[in-house]
Amino acid sequence: MLELNFSQTLGNHCLTINETLPANGITAIFGVSGAGKTSLINAISGLTRPQKGRIVLNGRVLNDAEKGICLTPEKRRVGYVFQDARLFPHYKVRGNLRYGMSKSMVDQFDKLVALLGIEPLLDRLPGSLSGGEKQRVAIGRALLTAPELLLLDEPLASLDIPRKRELLPYLQRLTREINIPMLYVSHSLDEILHLADRVMVLENGQVKAFGALEEVWGSSVMNPWLPKEQQSSILKVTVLEHHPHYAMTALALGDQHLWVNKLGEPLQAALRIRIQASDVSLVLQPPQQTSIRNVLRAKVVNSYDDNGQVEVELEVGGKTLWARISPWARDELAIKPGLWLYAQIKSVSITA
């Protein structure tokens, strides 16, 4: 568990945090440049020193301004991966990985190397590596120090699109197989969608929202970040069954289900899906003989006018689903809170 209750002033910027983060999964730190994202993880890592408050990791006090406690970075058991990999140019990859390696991680070396797909790189110098390869090595080096927490400061920011696509699957694999909590700084919605369990939104050094990805994503805090045509819902589902005759998989959403193209995941596997509001249409009665496979019973929570369109907030199986319709459709269907209807979903994307 990471307890953050501190304030810090750097130049004209003031960062104030009072949150407790669970000791598992990935928490994305999100916001514009200058919002305080890097300042936050620098304070946690010990690169800067807050003027007020405390930082406590798994019961160990890293910072306590009143008591004058400020552990040095090397005593914090916190790994840090920067935007640029910062590898030692005169060491081969193997040497970079072993630099600072904890004795407790010696037996884990081969497993971690395989997990990150860097075994073929062990005898190469950093200068011969691609940007994505360098970042995989940097992540491996940080993990081999046996940290209790891993900080990643926009690790994909300096990479081109092909290299980002190369690195994302390795980060996703890490989240599944390495039981180390991570703070992931990013201003990329795509990265957050694919990686984060939770999101903390910072603005001018203040926390605007903090919670599960699907909750924060559907909140008004994210509206400025989402172009109107990209308003969407993030939902947690589980694999329910695979169709016996067609290449389709059913995903459980409450007591209802969604059909998607066949997945390789086993039954009961947990997934996260994204549904664009523009891919959801509404009808008052169950449609007959329709080509749309996904028709869900839903209740209207509210509706909002938005530049000539209407955003309809629905509840499906205790989850929030958004639909975008025209004012004409709203009036003709008499959309109002509490109305039960059917949501027709044209497309579903798997995000994680």
Curated annotation (Swiss-Prot):
Disulfide-bonded cysteines: none
Ranges where the Mop domain occurs: 289-352
One MF annotation (Gene Ontology) recorded for this entry: ATP hydrolysis activity
Subcellular localization: Cell inner membrane
GO cellular component, one term: plasma membrane
Segments traversing the membrane: none
SUPFAM superfamilies in alphabetical order: MOP-like (SSF50331), P-loop containing nucleoside triphosphate hydrolases (SSF52540)
Binding site residues for ATP: G31, V32, S33, G34, A35, G36, K37, T38
Pfam families linked: ABC_tran (PF00005), TOBE (PF03459)
Catalytic activity: molybdate(out) + ATP + H2O = molybdate(in) + ADP + phosphate + H(+)
UniProt-listed Enzyme Commission number(s): 7.3.2.5
Keywords, sorted A to Z: ATP-binding, Cell inner membrane, Cell membrane, Membrane, Molybdenum, Nucleotide-binding, Translocase, Transport
Topology in membrane: Peripheral membrane protein
Sequence ranges assigned to domain ABC transporter in this UniProt record: 1-229
PROSITE patterns given in the database record: ABC_TRANSPORTER_1 (PS00211), ABC_TRANSPORTER_2 (PS50893), MODC (PS51241), MOP (PS51866)
Assembly and interaction partners: The complex is composed of two ATP-binding proteins (ModC), two transmembrane proteins (ModB) and a solute-binding protein (ModA).
Protein family according to the UniProt entry: Belongs to the ABC transporter superfamily. Molybdate importer (TC 3.A.1.8) family.
Function (record text): Part of the ABC transporter complex ModABC involved in molybdenum import. Responsible for energy coupling to the transport system.
Protein name, UniProt field: Molybdenum import ATP-binding protein ModC
Source species: Shigella flexneri
Source lineage: Bacteria, Pseudomonadati, Pseudomonadota, Gammaproteobacteria, Enterobacterales
